[in-house]
Amino acid sequence: MNIKNVLLTFLLAISFSQSAVADKQQYIMQFKVGKGAEVRAYLVRAGFQIQRHFPQRHALIIRVPAKAIEALRKIPHIEILEQDHRRYLLSTQQVPYGISLVQADQVSDSNAASSKVCIIDSGYQLAHEDLSDNSVTGSSDTGSGNWYEDENGHGTHVAGTIAAFNNDKGVVGILPNGLLQLHIVKVFDAQGWAYSSSLVAALDDCLAHGADVVSMSLGGFKKSRFERDAFSDAYARGVLSVAAAGNGGNSRHLYPASYNDVISVAAIDQDKNVANFSQQTDQVELSAPGVNVLSTVSMGAGRSASVTINMDAYSAKAMGGSVLGESAGGLVDCGLGETPCAARGDICLIKRGNITYADKALACQAEGGVAAIIYNNTAGELLGMLGDVAVHIPVVGVTDLIGAEMLGRLGEAETVTLKVAASNYAFFNGTSMATPHVAGVAALVWSNHPECSNEGIRQALQASAEDLGEVGRDNATGYGLVKAEAAIDHINSLGCAVECKRRFKRKWPFIGGLAQHLYSTAATRPFSLLYPRMAAALK
């Protein structure tokens, strides 16, 4: 087949494709010596844009739709036709999977200086290497300590998902360039609970400091009229409140997430599956990444883990509460860890199930084991907590596949090295981790369309969400996975006009757009930071 026929076939193949332009990829085309001019002439005639020419290497770079490659391979003079692969700067910075999943890496935050997110949580470690360059102010509730310190680490993790700085360290957030304004209200100390009245006071503080979006990775099962009316008032003032749906893995409503004027956020994993701990209610509105979320924690409070067998490195996650340290020894199969195994001076390999992670580690420790590796009994990473149990050996979790591979190496005369070290970053699970993804996306979209109201942004997020699970809205994922670029495209196309009818019917009477206060008093109820049930997981 000659060049003319090949190009004619190619042009016919793509002429009916509406997605041909969007589907283009960059390829390296190397041709026979002396045939460069002929190949280039026909490519230009066919409408191709040649990106670069390497005359000394008899090659050029072109961008073509993927479906055209097979046709181009038939050109007689072509010796190499391969994709022009990307290369990256090698840095220690990681982009958490959630950033790309919600399309934050597809949208510029160059207009974010006009937006403010208020985070109500356990504080913000201002000295953190990935957070210190942000534009941030803060307040503290009585008795909770300084807002710029975080004894718990929860609030710092949330803040990192929203605004970790793009500085070649650690991670990046949804708005990573230090332009977004943050206001921190610290209502929790290291104990991780406060009252509903504290939350209302924190919300008032957010309003007083001009917040556009309020992020709350917290909640409790008892509703409060006083609290409900405060969020209705905030919504009427143009503020968008976002809260975690809850980590009970059931259908109970959690508050403030289940108030009509608050966006309730469910958690999904990297594969867009619903997290088994995520609440499923008729108030769930949007979903976001909440499983194995890597973000900032108080400096040195995180844990990094590594396991090597000879020169082979394996991915591992330090168990929450694990001691720091490095251990080496042989590898011993200890089953489920329910019965003694001969582990003196060695590392225990234990399967997840039946008893707690702490009990497995204690059994290993009692038999003289120097460290423990617990492998998952289902697909995926294993993130676990040892709780308050005093375990004195390093403990890590690995996937089911890594566990199976390690079992296959038990007979090898090799030394296993396991290390748990201090880190400024950590993997957390929970709807607490999903919530800042939605709050951050809301702020990012709003910064690109400041003419929209909070209701307009809310409806755009709903309309543009990626539908997951059942067709349409469902109790597990709401309208679906929040998407920044899709929401902006939706507004670009349709504007941000608000529909008259909202999906959620208001359960309480309103006057003039503000909540009518029907009651003069309400019980002050406790609420808490949201942690998943992994700390007590037995199987």
Predicted regions and their residues:
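Bacterial N-terminal signal peptides
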Residues: 9-15
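Protease zymogen maturation seam
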Residues: 24, 38-57, 70-116, 124-130, ...
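Acidic glycine-/aspartate-rich tracts in secreted/extracellular proteins
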Residues: 34-36, 86-87, 122-126, 166-168, ...
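C-terminal subdomain of the subtilisin-like protease fold in secreted/lumenal serine endopeptidases
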Residues: 50-53, 172-175, 184, 197-219, ...
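N-terminal domain-start motif of subtilase-like serine proteases
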Residues: 52, 63-69, 90-119, 139-153, ...
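Subtilisin-like serine protease catalytic core
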Residues: 105-137, 146-197, 258-261, 271-273, ...
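Extracellular S/T/G-rich loop segment that most often corresponds to the catalytic His/Ser-adjacent loop
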Residues: 116, 121, 129, 239, ...
